[in-house]
A protein has these predicted regions:
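Hydrophobic alpha-helical transmembrane segments
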Residues: 1-4, 23-29, 48-58, 76-91, 118-147
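Cytosolic juxtamembrane helix and N-cap/initiation of the first transmembrane helix
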Residues: 1-17, 133, 145-163
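Hydrophobic transmembrane helix segments
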Residues: 14-54
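Alpha-helical transmembrane segments of integral membrane proteins
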Residues: 2-9, 52, 74-81, 133-140
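Juxtamembrane non-transmembrane "cap" segments at the membrane-aqueous interface
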Residues: 95-119
Length: 163
């Protein structure tokens, strides 16, 4: 599969995964005290239009990239890729810096309050707190989206420039 096509596929999986973890209760996979999934909030009449709009907005990058891919709009694909790269950078800053160098007191309190009962796939070593499983999968998907898009866009750039 060509990298750009693979990136579109990875983006579809990412968009689907993000919706699933936001809407459905998946036990400890997406358990966060005080933040019930939107599906539960909707059943109890607590989901707002703003909540639904925000979740819909997370599908927009995939739709825009897919449109740009189908029309050959490389500049728009680059903008989309930059957006995904910023999201990935925020994930790295939030999770991996604390895992590699140790959590600040503030992050330690947040982690214990919100993520201590989440599914863990990586070991926790003292103050070196890993991303929970839900975020780890999200980060793997984001990384694949960004890498595949950049490789695909650079490869198509070489082909366009050499013709």
């Amino acid at each position: 599969m060509k990298p750009l096509r693979a990136s579109v596929f990875a983006q579809a999986i990412l968009a689907f995964y993000f919706q699933v973890i936001q809407w459905l209760p998946l036990g400890n996979w997406n358990y966060q005290p005080g933040f019930p999934p939107l599906g539960i909030q909707a059943i109890h009449g607590h989901a707002t239009a703003q909540d639904v709009l925000l979740m819909t907005a997370f599908v927009a990058p995939f739709v825009v990239f897919w449109f740009a891919y189908s029309k050959g709009l490389r500049w728009l694909m680059w903008i989309g890729t930059c957006g995904y790269a910023v999201w990935l950078a925020l994930e790295v800053k939030t999770w991996w810096v604390a895992y590699a160098f140790g959590a600040t007191d503030s992050w330690l309190r947040i982690y214990q309050r919100v993520f201590s009962r989440s599914t863990q796939l990586l070991p926790s070593l003292g103050r070196h707190l890993p991303p929970d499983g839900m975020h780890l999968v999200l980060q793997v998907l984001l990384t694949s989206v960004v890498v595949l898009a950049v490789v695909g866009l650079l490869k198509t750039s070489v082909r366009v420039d050499s013709t």
